[in-house]
């Protein structure tokens, strides 16, 4: 059998209704796109300082407060640039002297690098774990920020979010929820900053960061700003806090992103909120993991079920199967973005089961994979 992508034609009855399974940018629902088309003239191309766009930001902030059942004093803060920019925002505006990190994949490591290389901070304490496993930082003398990912998108590992034992009373727990927010369970009271971008479970485009901040974290941001530390204007967390209270961002946002995000949050809340969303992602991901466990050629990359993500499933293949060829053949049939994270370097498929992904589409995807595997092993 040829390895050419077009050499396998998957029967139409096996194909999912929507073939997008990427881990970010991820699936945007048709209903969101229709809402964008319907409302676009009212908001696209209008001032972000005026009521139509400010109402969008207000919908987002109110919707997230409902979704995460925010305690009194917690605030939803927005800024431009995505989670990558927020790492620098946090280095400048949240870490007083020293950060402690757990890293077990590409994205946790990038935030650790941001604080560890900041010339105005002490060397970070970094706990390393092998890709495919998870970790949470332990109490470290002098650390005033403890940071780790809720979900490591590169490896498909999820962690429990709980304030580490023995840390200082005023230490901040800062969680990268970029691919976890809205698809994994969380008690926000265990966090001081729960930050994410909207291009995954939140069903929108990238280029925006959102941070749910505790009163303790807000106080820290003001403390650092008042200390006289030089902070670039575009990375000033206090500026973002104060603009968000006015339902706006410091500089011009991508308004379409805001609209798609508002629609997604309200869709999740309207269906039952975080409890509904997390049950949906759990059931979808379990389909993938059970399939791998019953396969003769595939295994779950994350071996400990307790570490397996409900929103990003990583599946290894043995040497008899070239996963890249499988992904190419799926793509040629309209089933896209199941390639592994590029730097992980494994013979693997990575399948997103974000809340926008219909469980029936996951079942169809697995049938398509079986069809391709049968074809390439004849």
Can you say where each PLM-predicted feature lies in the sequence?
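N-terminal "arm"/small-domain region of PLP-dependent enzymes with the aminotransferase-like
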Residues: 1-47
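PLP-dependent enzyme catalytic core of the Aspartate aminotransferase-like
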Residues: 2, 18, 343, 347-378
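Active-site C-terminal subdomain of aminotransferase-like
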Residues: 27, 199-282, 286-289
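Conserved N-terminal alpha-helix of the aminotransferase class I/II PLP-enzyme fold
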Residues: 40-89, 110-114
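Active-site phosphate-binding strand-loop segment of PLP-dependent enzymes
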Residues: 129-182, 193, 201
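Conserved PLP-binding catalytic core of the aspartate aminotransferase-like
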Residues: 299-329
């Amino acid at each position: 059998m040829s390895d050419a992508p077009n050499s396998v034609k998957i029967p139409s009855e096996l194909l999912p209704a929507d073939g997008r399974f990427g881990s970010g940018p991820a699936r945007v629902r048709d209903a969101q796109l229709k809402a964008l088309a319907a409302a676009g003239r009212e908001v696209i191309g209008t001032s972000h300082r005026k009521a139509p766009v400010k109402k969008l930001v207000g919908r987002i902030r109110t919707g997230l407060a409902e979704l995460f059942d925010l305690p009194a004093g917690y605030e939803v803060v927005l800024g431009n640039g995505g989670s990558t920019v927020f790492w620098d925002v946090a280095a400048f505006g949240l870490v007083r002297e020293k950060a402690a990190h757990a890293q077990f994949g590409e994205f946790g490591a990038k935030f650790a690098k941001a604080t560890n290389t900041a010339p105005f901070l002490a060397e970070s304490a970094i706990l390393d774990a092998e890709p495919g496993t998870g970790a949470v930082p332990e109490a470290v003398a002098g650390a005033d920020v403890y940071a780790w990912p809720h979900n490591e998108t590169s490896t498909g590992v999820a962690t429990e979010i709980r304030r580490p034992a023995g840390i200082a009373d005023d230490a901040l727990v800062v969680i990268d929820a970029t691919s976890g927010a809205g698809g994994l369970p969380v008690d926000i009271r265990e966090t001081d900053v729960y930050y994410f971008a909207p291009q995954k479970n939140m069903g929108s485009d990238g280029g925006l960061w959102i941070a749910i901040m505790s009163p303790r974290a807000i106080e820290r941001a003001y403390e650092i700003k008042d200390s006289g530390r030089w902070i670039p204007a575009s990375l000033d967390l206090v500026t973002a806090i104060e603009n968000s209270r006015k339902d706006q961002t410091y500089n011009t946002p991508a308004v379409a992103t805001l609209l798609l995000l508002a629609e997604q949050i309200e869709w999740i809340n309207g269906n039952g909120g975080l409890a509904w969303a997390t049950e949906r992602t759990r059931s979808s991901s379990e389909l993938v993991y059970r399939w791998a466990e019953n396969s003769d050629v595939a295994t779950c990359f994350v071996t400990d079920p307790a570490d397996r993500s409900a929103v990003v499933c990583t599946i290894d293949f043995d040497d008899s199967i070239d996963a890249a060829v499988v992904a190419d053949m799926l793509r040629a049939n309209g089933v896209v973005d199941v390639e592994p994270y590029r730097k992980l370097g494994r013979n693997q498929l990575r399948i997103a089961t974000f809340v926008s992904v219909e469980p029936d589409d996951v079942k169809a995807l697995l049938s398509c994979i079986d069809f391709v595997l049968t074809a390439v092993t004849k």
